[in-house]
Amino acid sequence: MKLNKIMIAAVLAFGASSMVAQAANQGSGTITFTGEIIDAPCSIAPGNIDQTIPMGQISNLSLKDGRASELKQPVSILLEDCTSATQKTVKTTFTGQPGGAAGTDNKMIGLGSGSTAKGASIVMTDDENGNAVIELGKATAGQGIKAGQEKAELKFTAFLKGNGGALDTIVPGAFSSVVNFALNYQ
């Protein structure tokens, strides 16, 4: 009888502890931190490293004969934690697939191979330098960062432009395109 009471107490104690353990796990997950240490006077803000810019739904008629869409999208790269004691100029070089009708125009960014839309390309301009058209593989004129300035915003604009063909060469459909950027402080 004494043994039965000990066994019952042990079973109850074990059962109660297992219920407590089950109640403790009410959700779990993993947090992964990523980043990169760079040798530069400024950091690139986290939301500005990899961006998606929605270009909208653009009428094929607005791109006929090489016309540019009026739907222009701002593109910016926010720099933070700038620590330069002297004024710096930062130049941006964009690289990607050239656009245009022959796919060789470095002043246009070609639509990606998975795009169903055809007959247009993306053009980017440098807002801080007279809206100059950006040429792939060539550094921009540069934007100034003043001594002691902690933040800076590099401003650009992107828009879709027809490749110069008639309306029947502009095929409606979805498109995407990728362009990479590299910063060079001087």
Please report, for each region that a protein language model flagged, where it lies by residue.
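Mature extracellular/passenger domains of Gram-negative fimbrial/pilin and adhesin proteins
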Residues: 2-6, 21-186
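Bacterial N-terminal signal peptides
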Residues: 9-16
